[in-house]
Amino acid sequence: MKYLLRVVTLTCMVMAGVGAWVSPGYGEPYELSKNDVMDTKTLKSADISLFGVKLGDSEAKALDSLVNEKIPGVKVEQEASFIFLLDQRKPTGPMAGVRIQDGKVDLIFINNRFSYKTRGIFRNVLNSESPDDVRKLLGQEDYGDENVMGAILSYDKQGFVINYLGKDVNVEFSPLR
């Protein structure tokens, strides 16, 4: 009986320790800065999160997660309806961010300045050399436009758009239509 009590107590302590160690952001299906998801077929914009903020989250949650919590190496600025994340090393422009409308997050964006913090398939997308490289990674777009200046590749069924302008690559995640 004494042995059983010790085992149960030890198990409870281990489970409590594991629960405290795993942060809430790890439960997201695809956290841009943490998960190495490579399967693009099941990827939807509703499953994407940026430092714990997902599409449809409240303004309060976005402010708490992005502004109030310190993110290493990231400078945060809030302008109008946007929360911009800038690289502290070279704060030349936003590398990622969210747009808030009607009290909810309705757009998450990342660009190639954010590639060093991105994991999984979108790191490869942000570092791609051409629109064809993006197509090899994500498959054929639903529709798009390509000219000498660059390309817009729209993956509406999955809820994101890739803007490819030479070395500048932007990914915008929005709610599915």
What do the PLM-derived regions correspond to, one by one?
Residues 13-18:
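Hydrophobic h-region of N-terminal signal peptides that target proteins for export
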Residues 29-30, 57-104, 120, 124-177:
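A cross-family detector of function-defining hotspots
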Residues 112-116, 174:
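Glyoxalase I/VOC metalloenzyme domain signal
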